UniProtKB/Swiss-Prot annotation:
Pyridoxal kinase involved in the salvage pathway of pyridoxal 5'-phosphate (PLP). Catalyzes the phosphorylation of pyridoxal to PLP. Belongs to the pyridoxine kinase family. PdxY subfamily. PANTHER family: PYRIDOXAL KINASE. It is an enzyme of class 2 (transferase). ATP binds at residues 114, 151, 184, 211-214. This is Pyridoxal kinase PdxY.
Amino acid sequence: MKRTPHLLAIQSHVVFGHAGNSAAVFPMQRVGVNVWPLNTVQFSNHTQYGQWAGEVLAPAQIPALVEGISNIGELGNCDAVLSGYLGSAEQGRAILAGVARIKAVNPKALYLCDPVMGHAEKGCIVPAEVSEFLLEEAVAKADILCPNQLELDSFCGRRAESLEDCVGMARGLLERGPRIVLVKHLNYPGRADDAFEMLLVTGEESWHLRRPLLAFPRQPVGVGDLTSGLFMARLLLGDSDVQAFEFAAAAVHEVLLETQACASYELQLVRAQDRIAHPRVRFEAQRLLY
């Protein structure tokens, strides 16, 4: 029997709705990965509602929880760590310590960093210290980095001017540590208005993917968390980088189609669960020559 992969997911949790682990855990489980959720914050709802209740996890709890898993002999079974929204830079450093602890017992374990700083339509949504931590410390430790356009621009200290420029900026990030950069949402001058564009860059290749841009009165939150989670899950299940890229794009589109059909502000993960596991649509990534 083929072994089921295990992934430690360290990011936010909301009681109502879908963001952070609340957007990523169930879909990753649905495609066949055992997920260990470690919630950096527990909020009543995501912050784009404008009000919320809850609290941030004390940074010291992160290594304590990782050590607790070690104490029962399971830490070596962790195949990957995924981190997302951080409540503080101190939390981020605790996560890096946890990643190092896991890699010490399983050198093949991967670390995917979703460097949540902001969104083009929402601006910066984390404290300055968190952005500084991501820009200066996390990038060097990540095997896979999954920024959006705003975050890619922040890493490089300037705005991208074209698709080719985005590729060059992603290649610059590869020189700082990661082996894969997945730009979850491209937003550069001259891009198509009716398409949602994504980019995958490795040391050898670059791939561009377009899918239809769906209209919403308010853009659902958690799409990036869902994308990063599904990409990591499919890699653990044996997909190539490009296969995982294409699968994540298709599965996310299926969720958005269901969300749009329900006229919902929250991602409709449960209603779309069968199409997450087996997307009916397929988007083919195009290899770029630069």
